[in-house]
Amino acid sequence: WIMGHMVNAIYQIDEFVNLGANSIETDVSFDDNANPEYTYHGIPCDCGRSCLKWENYNDFLKGLRSATTPGNSKYQSKLILVVFDLKTGSLYDNQASEAGKKLAKNLLKHYWNNGNNGGRAYIVLSIPDLNHYPLIKGFTDTLKQEGHPELLEKVGYDFSGNDAIGDVVKAYKKAGVSGHVWQSDGITNCLLRGLSRVKDAVANRDSGKGYINKVYYWTVDKRATTRDALDAGVDGVMTNYPDVIADVMNEAAYKNKVRLATYEDSPWVTFKK
């Protein structure tokens, strides 16, 4: 999965997919009442990027739905996965469950079209703080209460705080999650980070008794870092330059080892070599 980083304006969806991304990451900010409000990152953000692009969250969802609904004039068949980077740092811990409920209602209405031929992309809810694990239960309970438990097949989870893997597993157990787990590791492109935790996550994924289904690394903008990440066995790389990742995947060392994921590749099933 080539994951376009910080896609917060509707026009950027096409821009990143046309550069080679089959997945995007979108920031979600919340208001004081735990309502998802804007797709907005803010300052500071990655070096070389504008931090200030934004849409109203519901408008973005409608644009995303158009881009991921077969038959729509704006349909992009390659776009199969969306990571919502939930900026829950602005919320009190006791608002996490409420944020999950509201997120579920927004997605159900504006993205899934109340279960009636909505967008088809898989969704990953990425949460920066392990203490906000109740967001997951708020989300899953709400979809069930609204009569659409089947949509949970399209939803996965990620804790993005670079916490110890054991602590992440404990948070998932508390949230009642036993699958659909992506594990992120990384740092802004302005700084360097080693791959030791990525390798730990990959080992957990491949152990057969681990908790992790997929591993992605962020933010990867350079060819050398891309090669290191692919060599470490990641499933996804998040990038500001999807074309760079696509170029590396076409190099002789990789073109027979890795390929771009398609809609038929489940993002929840660990890939067996």
Curated annotation (Swiss-Prot):
Subcellular location: Secreted
GO BP annotations, alphabetical order: killing of cells of another organism; lipid catabolic process
Gene3D superfamilies: Phosphatidylinositol (PI) phosphodiesterase (3.20.20.190)
Cofactor: how and how many bound: Binds 1 Mg(2+) ion per subunit.
Sorted UniProt keywords: Cytolysis, Dermonecrotic toxin, Disulfide bond, Hemolysis, Lipid degradation, Lipid metabolism, Lyase, Magnesium, Metal-binding, Secreted, Toxin
One GO MF term: toxin activity
Catalysed conversion reaction: an N-(acyl)-sphingosylphosphocholine = an N-(acyl)-sphingosyl-1,3-cyclic phosphate + choline; an N-(acyl)-sphingosylphosphoethanolamine = an N-(acyl)-sphingosyl-1,3-cyclic phosphate + ethanolamine; a 1-acyl-sn-glycero-3-phosphocholine = a 1-acyl-sn-glycero-2,3-cyclic phosphate + choline; a 1-acyl-sn-glycero-3-phosphoethanolamine = a 1-acyl-sn-glycero-2,3-cyclic phosphate + ethanolamine
Keyword Transmembrane: no
Binding site for Mg(2+): E25, D27, D85
Source species, domain of life: Eukaryota
Enzyme class: lyase
GO CC annotations on file: extracellular region
Active site positions, chain numbering: H5, H41 (nucleophile)
Disulfide bonds: C45-C51, C47-C190
Cofactor(s) this protein cannot do without: Mg(2+)
Organs and tissues of expression: Expressed by the venom gland.
EC number(s) given by UniProt: 4.6.1.-
Family: Belongs to the arthropod phospholipase D family. Class II subfamily.
Annotated function: Dermonecrotic toxins cleave the phosphodiester linkage between the phosphate and headgroup of certain phospholipids (sphingolipid and lysolipid substrates), forming an alcohol (often choline) and a cyclic phosphate. This toxin acts on sphingomyelin (SM). It may also act on ceramide phosphoethanolamine (CPE), lysophosphatidylcholine (LPC) and lysophosphatidylethanolamine (LPE), but not on lysophosphatidylserine (LPS), and lysophosphatidylglycerol (LPG). It acts by transphosphatidylation, releasing exclusively cyclic phosphate products as second products.
Protein name (Swiss-Prot/TrEMBL): Dermonecrotic toxin LhSicTox-alphaIA2bii
Lineage, opening ranks: Eukaryota, Metazoa, Ecdysozoa, Arthropoda, Chelicerata
